[in-house]
C-alpha cells in the first residue's frame, strides 16, 4: 500500500505550520509504523526542489512558480508531474488532500482520490455569512468532482460541506 498526501504545510524546521501539516505528519508517521509507504508532495517554502526522508516518510517539496497570474497552473502541473514520477517508481494506491488540492491535477488510472474536509472555502463562507469567491469556489467544486471519496475531520464539517459536493 502506498498513500500520497498533498500538502504545502508539512512541518519543516524554521517555518510555521498549522493543523493540516500536523495532522498529515501524525497520520503519515503512524502509517509508516504499520509498514505502509507514505509520500508527501507539496510546494516548498524555499525557492528550490527538495526531497527528504523524515521518520520513514518521503517528503517532496517543489519549487513554487513565480509566474504572476499563472502560478496556480504551473504549480499544479509540477505537482502532477511529481505524482506521475512517484507512481511509475512505486505505484500509489491513494492520493489524499484538502479541499482545493485536486482541482487542476490530472487523474491517474488505478489511484483513488480522497478529499479530507477540514473546512474549505464554501464551508467558511457559509459560517462567516459572506459570499463565495468565484475563483476559489470554482476550484473547490472542480476538486470535489474529481474525488472518489471524502473524509471529514468532524460531522459538523461533513454536514455543512455535503450540500456543496
Sequence positions of predicted segments:
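N-terminal subdomain of nucleotide-sugar transferases
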Residues: 1-47, 55
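Nucleotide-sugar donor phosphate/pyrophosphate-binding loop at the beta->alpha transition
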Residues: 77-78, 123-142, 146
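Short N-terminal targeting/anchoring amphipathic segment
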Residues: 83-102
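A short, active-site helix/loop in glycosyltransferases that binds the activated sugar's phosphate group
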Residues: 143-165
